[in-house]
Amino acid sequence: VSSDTQFVGYYRRPELTAEAVSDGRLRTGDIGYLDAAGYLYVTDRAKDMVVSGGMNVYPAEVEAALADVPGLAELAVFGVPDERWGEAVVAVAVVTDPTLDEAALIRAARERIASYKKPTQVRFLAALPRTASLKVDKPQLRRAWAEGIGLSPD
């Protein structure tokens, strides 16, 4: 992306600026496609993509596929290191129905999307952590997952 109003860089962060701006163009990190009519559809962020067993999994696609599961309030999908597959797709859920468990969510995913895209594990929280801009704080969730802090399987 380039424009007259584009930012010129990160304040005192030349390494981040070098990653984001090249030849005057901003690398947004968005992944998307153009349809036959030329409309651009943004499907996810490159940094959020999970590569599991050589297959690309877009967390936003998994989240959208499960968005209407009864009793599911919110879902955050991301990748974690996995010895066999490189990365595994996992999820953290907020539920309004206490009977909605890990097996039910994985089963719902299997019915709606390709099997390789389904979460291999689901953990539960009362609320998803948020950044100052109210986005789900996936880096915090990844750290919590790695450390096993505050995430329960039921």
Language model region names:
Residues 3-4, 8-9, 16-19, 24, ...:
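AMP-binding/adenylate-forming catalytic core of the ANL superfamily
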Residues 143-154:
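Acidic/polar alpha-helix N-cap and adjacent early helical turns
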